Amino acid sequence: DEIFRSMLANPGFEKDFAGTWTRAHYYPSGVESSCSIERDNTVAYSGTYSMHYHVGTAAVTEVSLGTDFRTAVKPNTSYKITLQAKTSAETSAEAKIWLNLGECFATPTWGDIYNDVQKGNILTGPQADWTAISATIYTAANAEYINVQPAVSGTGDFWFDHIIVVEIPGEANALDTAKNAALDSLDAAVAALDQNAYTYWNWALVQTAKMNGINAVKQASD
């Protein structure tokens, strides 16, 4: 089964949340009393359990539970994330289901978190059948961990299951090759310039990029 290839710990919620799914968000503050997040053994895409969100107030703009940056990743590498989601028939027409993905350095504190944004397709309204949400992420040059966090808004009952995170083979090398080719072209153009200061500045950016990845050029150019 593909779930056994998932890099996530507890991808099908067959075990307790403790130590695997612990990063809960309730927005705005104060809506927690009308919401709940729990494992559910009455609804499942595969196995016995799923993750169940109940949202009882329309004031909610986000309820979510994430892995809290426990999944180790390689820098400059592509990963695919897929999950299955469904809702109760009574779920509001305005309800939305999406996936938040974040990256961080070695120490997962707020000062180290970046690229913590919604990724992939968004489901809107009731979803009577299990429906896939899929996203890809290309990790930054200094990324070490990711957070996977299914999120909802609107009232109703929402279930998640079968969350798969896998590396996309070969894509990182292909992207690196393309970036290096572009940098080589820039290097050649820089070498043809006559103005020493301008030439040196661009040459320095190119060399930095080759050593540290394309993000170094973006940062140095800002």
Regions found by a protein language model. Give the residues of each.
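Beta-strand acidic-aromatic groove motif in beta-rich domains, primarily in extracellular
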Residues: R23-H25, T61-T67, E90-C104, Y145-V148
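Extracellular recognition modules
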Residues: T82-Q84, N147-A151
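Extracellular carbohydrate recognition and processing domains
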Residues: A106-A143, F158
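Extracellular carbohydrate recognition
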Residues: D129, N142, A151-E167
